[in-house]
Amino acid sequence: MKHQPDYTPIITAWQQLPSDCPERFVETALMSEMWKALGITPNQMAGGKIGNGLSPDWLIYRDQDKSKPPVLVVEDKKRISGFQALPDAEFDAKCRKYNLYKQAIGHPVPNANNNGIRQYLDKSKVSPHLLASYGLVFNGDFFQLWRRVDGLVLPMTPIQKVTAASIPLIMKQLEYCLNAPTKGLVVGLWNQKGGVGKTTNIINLGAELALNGKKVLLVDLDPQNDLTRGLDAKSPNYLEVYTNKLELNNFKQAKKILEKAICTRDFTTSLSKQQFTISILAGDGKGNFLKEFRESTAHTPKTKRDAIAKMFSLLAEDYDYIFADASPNTDILTLGMIFGSDVLLMPVDFDRRSLHHASALHHNLPKWRALRFKSGKGELPCGPWNLGLVFSNCPSERGAILENYISEELKKLKFTGKQYKTELKVLGQVKIAEFEKKPVCCFDSNPAAAAQLYRELASEVFLDHNFTDY
């Protein structure tokens, strides 16, 4: 596709668009100009039914070969007065309250039987050859891109206000979706309370995804190096020389340094004897170079934070999933992990403190996204988004009283994110696997026990349809 950098026709068409106009007029007067500027021809567009009762407004293909799945599915809406009057700083939060936006997403709306992006990217509802990787909701006032990674559907950008000044940026974002290589999902597992099973979860979720044919990288950013020792891995000190290359804008050499530091481990499951490989960007086993980098005065805190975040961006093209482990302390390594993650999965146990810390992170994520979006000048993808709570170290018998305390505490904390049904119990096989320095699927003699729980969690969170917009 040839990109036309002159967005004047789009800006002019938008400026001439009435503040109240029907959906069809938004499509013919404005969106047709957008597709033209992106070099998209009529042979790259389609419409029609993609599943039972599912008929999006547009399917956009990378080229004229429609035997491959579309790259983008679009749901557009009419323009109504009121959106342009919303303050820029509050546009995302206030736009979410409008039924028109909710309908575009596919949220339930009173007296409406609507489908939207969450249905059009649902792998359980859409024919595989019509299932897109990206989604767009648009009405001439709001613009938001969405992303699908296996079964997980999540925002790729905040809700952006369409203005003459923002049109060049949103066009570049569309161009990214149409042309950029697909990047893997960067997942941070974190809670400010320690002992909630984040490292154990990373190792075993990574293993289950690798068993499903996914290319998985685990990154140890915790100076305790539990992940490194937990898989008997070791990497050379890469951070200082890598950061120096970044400061020179030598991204190619910076990535090569990371690639050389990555080690791999091969495993075999205990029951099916299935082989799989996990890649690890490890520490040195003692956490020395992570501590040195954290405490170094050779780089500013912002440089160190951005270097960690950029690491994920550089490596994401080579993996399906990247899982990052960081200290419970909010040091610069942890902040870099949060800043560079697409999503955060928050392990909690049946403890009031872990719920408190998870809820605090949940409420702070919009600020992190806004900072990342602003500092990255709209670079995609933008995160982190809240993937939800996973209960770890669960007692086998907890009773209704404890369940009620947990539920009431989350209500008090105003936690509105997801809570996964799969709960990870304390089982001996997990401890045996830790001593053997392998994932539990390599030492689980009971398929209904530990490994099965991680298998179910990997499916619930990543492989089966799972929608989040927190």
Residue locations for each model-derived region?
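A short, conserved, highly charged catalytic patch centered on acidic carboxylates
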Residues: 1-134, 148-185
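Charged, structured surface patches that assemble and position nucleic-acid processing machinery
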Residues: 137-139
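P-loop NTP-binding core
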Residues: 145-146, 151-470
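Loop/turn residues immediately N-terminal
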Residues: 141-143
